[in-house]
Regions:
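N-terminal FAD cofactor-binding segment of flavoenzymes
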Residues: 45-94
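C-terminal auxiliary extensions adjacent to catalytic cores
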Residues: 392-447
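Iron-sulfur cluster-binding cysteine motifs and their immediate structural context
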Residues: 485-516, 523-546
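Beta1/beta-strand and adjacent pyrophosphate-binding region of the FAD-binding site
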Residues: 4-19, 41
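Active-site-proximal substrate-binding core of FAD-dependent oxidoreductases
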Residues: 329-335, 347, 351-396, 513-515, ...
């Protein structure tokens, strides 16, 4: 057996997103304040920091103001403050603008900024490195390391140079062990190691199941005459019907570009729904098509998001580490924001870890982190909106949204609801194919609407082809023998990258094909597969999308 080299750190962080980078920065800040020399490294599976980051994004700067008060001096996010905030309710041909006074003040986007979250993370990485943080892009954390007492003591990166059949190629290199006094998992939504941590330590015992949405995003260069920097629009209603929930966004950002996208909540019941196709159909609405006329699509991507809110947040700590950011699920769905809460979670965990290490502790539970969360503005913010998502799911888009609005207003005025509604797993919601009708989707015209393969091309996705398939099946027979007759194999449609296909059905010999090289790491298959037969694991580090400005 090949021996792996090891490197010791005080803290190891898995994932260079906003939570992981904020944790690293705050950890070094606290160490400097106490006159201590503490070490921290950040592992990032993307080819560079930001390569796998995708968001709208409209960002509340509250955590940035706390972490780096002078951020406006040189951060690219500061270029475009939000100047206008609109909410459209769509029918197939028309829109209704929701009156501003109908929504609570915390939904108004006052003082926020719109821009690329990937570029914000690149900027944060630079600030982290200035403080002495070591960042390793292109290294995927593939294994959790446990000590003899079962406590987490770090992670190991994946082996490189392994062929599809599992044999070692000529360029084989074993993974590297990174040992830590505390390990933070900041993998984002549905992290594969986070799943193992939650299962191993039963962290979800007292929380609801996490629930999810799939965001499909495009970046467009539009007609300069139509561009209004700082204009932010959210939509609800069409094209989704009674069997699905979600909504769209249009953000006028820097350089004449518009970020647009559509989130489909993954509790939908019709197995013929395609979140990718819903987004393409949404663009054909007259108001949206007019904005994009004469423009050009320049980038594409997709990513699942955690929608469960407060009641789905698991226990945040375990012996030897913590969950931060969207690994835990701090997204505020009604505000359509999670960057500020993710950053704050990382900062709170970092402060707890620094204090513990300076007190000569290691590998125990950082109880100060959940205590800080309980006393923080993050928990208060999430508590106010905790019933919004379940109300919309239970009562539908319009009645549910109305009831949700009432609860938010009451909570805003301090009238706390005496109940918290429950969530149910997204993979349990599909109906049999014979009980539903397939939606009608537009044929791609290559100008306004597109197919999945040409879209994946714009994500700059690349994987080493001669490596083990990272989309694993617990039982290879299930897709054809169960999912196909029951649901017409929904993986063909819920995947936004064309990874899954059924071929040979026309000659009576159906076969399930996995085009793993197309995978944009959205994690939807791991979430929505009705039998939970698909398990997403990391491919070689550096593989996946390379989002330049998303």
């Amino acid at each position: 057996m090949t021996t792996r080299e090891s490197m010791p750190y005080d803290v190891v962080i898995v994932g260079a997103g906003p939570a992981g980078l904020s944790a690293a920065i705050r950890f070094k800040q606290v160490a400097a304040e106490k006159g201590a020399d503490l070490s921290v490294c950040v592992l990032e599976k993307g080819s560079e920091v930001g390569a796998h980051i995708l968001s709208g994004a409209v960002i509340d700067p509250r955590s940035l103001d706390e972490l780096l008060p002078d951020w406006r001096d040189d951060c690219p996010l500061a270029e475009v403050p939000v100047t206008e905030n609109l909410h459209w309710v769509l029918t197939e041909k028309k829109k209704t603008v929701l009156p501003h006074l109908w929504t609570p003040p915390f939904l108004h986007n006052k003082g926020t900024y719109t821009g690329s979250l990937g570029n914000l993370c690149r900027w944060l990485a630079g600030k982290a490195e200035e403080l002495g943080v070591e960042i390793f892009p292109g290294f995927a954390a593939a294994e959790i390391l446990f000590d003899e007492q079962g406590r987490v003591m770090g992670v190991a990166t994946g082996d490189m140079g392994v062929a599809r059949d599992g044999t070692h190629k000529s360029d084989y290199q074993p993974g590297l062990e990174l040992h830590a006094k505390y390990t933070f998992f900041a993998e984002g939504c549905r992290g594969h190691l986070t799943k193992e941590i939650i299962r191993t330590f039963d962290l979800a015992h007292d929380s609801d199941p996490q629930v999810y949405g799939l965001g499909v995003k495009e970046l467009w260069d539009i007609d300069p005459e139509l561009h209004q920097p700082g204009r932010v629009i959210h939509t609800q209603g069409w094209p989704l019907g009674d069997d699905a929930n979600g909504g769209g966004w249009l953000y006028h950002q820097a350089n004449g570009q518009v970020s647009l996208g559509f989130v489909t909540w993954l509790n939908y019941s019709n197995p013929y729904i395609s979140p990718f196709q819903e987004m393409q159909k949404w663009k054909t609405h007259p108001e949206i098509a007019a904005l994009l006329k004469g423009g050009k699509r320049v980038s594409y991507g997709a990513r699942a998001i955690s929608d469960g809110g407060l009641q789905s947040i698991p226990k945040l700590v375990f012996p030897g580490g913590a969950l931060i950011g969207d690994s835990a699920g701090f997204l505020n769905v009604p505000r359509i924001k999670g960057t500020h809460t993710a950053m704050k979670s990382g900062m709170m965990a970092a402060e707890a870890a620094a204090d513990a290490i300076l007190s000569q502790r290691q590998h125990d539970e950082l109880v100060a982190y959940p205590q800080a969360f309980d006393a923080s503005w993050v928990k208060k913010e999430l508590s106010i909106v905790r019933n919004v998502v379940p109300l919309v799911k239970k009562f539908g888009d319009f009645l549910g949204s109305g009831l949700a609005g009432v609860t938010m207003w009451l909570e805003h005025f301090g009238l706390k609801m005496p109940f918290t509604m429950k969530h149910h797993p997204d993979h349990e919601t599909l109906w049999r194919k014979d009980l539903v009708k397939p939606p009608v989707y537009p044929k791609p015209d290559g100008v306004l609407t597109f197919d999945r393969l040409s879209s994946v091309f714009l994500s700059n996705t690349n994987h080493e082809e001669d490596q083990p398939v990272h989309l694993t099946l617990k039982d290879p027979s299930v897709p054809v023998e169960y999912d196909l007759p029951m649901y017409d194999e929904p993986a063909q449609r819920y995947c936004p990258a064309g990874v899954y296909e059924i071929v040979g059905e026309d000659v009576g010999e159906p076969k399930f094909v996995i085009n793993a090289q197309n995978c944009v790491h959205c994690k939807t298959c791991d979430i929505k597969d009705p039998t939970q037969n698909i398990n997403w694991v990391v491919p070689e580090g550096g593989g996946g999308p390379n989002y330049p400005n998303m």
